A protein has these predicted regions:
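Residue-level signature of mid-helix packing/kink "hotspots" within the transmembrane helices
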Residues: 30-38, 123-124
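Symmetry-related core transmembrane helices of the 12-TM Major Facilitator Superfamily/SLC fold
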Residues: 142-158
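Cytoplasmic helix-loop-helix junction between adjacent transmembrane helices
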Residues: 81-118
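Helix-loop boundary and gating motifs at the non-cytosolic
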Residues: 1-30
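Paired small-residue
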Residues: 74-82
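Helix-to-loop junctions at the C-terminal end of transmembrane segments
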Residues: 37-48, 134
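Structural signature of the two symmetry-related core transmembrane helices
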Residues: 51-65, 147
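Helix-breaking motifs and short loop linkers at transmembrane-helix boundaries and internal kinks
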Residues: 16, 48, 69-74
Length: 177
């Protein structure tokens, strides 16, 4: 998402969109996260790590792929919604998995330290790669590369061992946020 969040506004400004339109475009990257946070958490609780991340990878791939195929402002807006929501869903599933996988406080500190490095690395590699590709090959190639990056993430976690589901005690009321 970070590469898309950098490239899409640049393309929008270059194509003559107003600053207000670009502001809306940037806001769309967060909008789906607002509305999907609770359902994504419930989905991760019900299905573990891999299925929510698989859906997130698919959403990010489609979002960036659409921008690569049709780099026009309305499609960039759809791409922002898809890639933003995908990022939020994946992070929720990963945080849930890591929190359940640790056995003690020391492991928790180490695991969440590593988990925080992931988004930081993504916030570097995405915009850096997109910027280089925009300069040397154009926006469409940058968007295509941003579509491939989530697939690489999937390759990293596809063999992760799923944790057993959480068994709720009998008579446990369904909590709703």
């Amino acid at each position: 998402m970070a590469g898309m969040r950098m490239a899409a506004p640049l393309m929008a400004l270059r194509s003559g969109q107003s600053e207000a339109a670009v502001g809306v475009l940037l806001a769309l990257f967060a909008l789906t996260q607002v509305f999907l946070a609770l359902p994504a958490g419930r989905y991760a609780d019900a299905h573990g790590l891999k299925r929510p991340v698989m859906w997130s990878v698919l959403m990010a791939f489609v979002g960036a792929g659409l921008a690569a195929l049709w780099p026009i402002f309305p499609v960039l807006c759809v791409s922002a919604l898809l890639t933003g929501g995908a990022t939020g869903g994946a992070i929720i599933a990963l945080q849930r998995h890591v929190g359940r996988a640790v056995k003690d406080t020391a492991q928790m500190k180490q695991a969440f330290s590593w988990l925080s490095i992931g988004p930081a690395f993504s916030n570097f590699i995405g915009p850096f790669t997109a910027g280089l590709l925009i300069d040397h090959a154009g926006f469409q190639w940058a968007y295509a590369a941003m579509a491939v990056l989530p697939l690489l993430g999937w390759l990293c976690i596809r063999h992760t061992r799923e944790l057993p589901p959480v068994i709720k005690p009998e008579g446990h009321e369904k909590n709703r946020a």
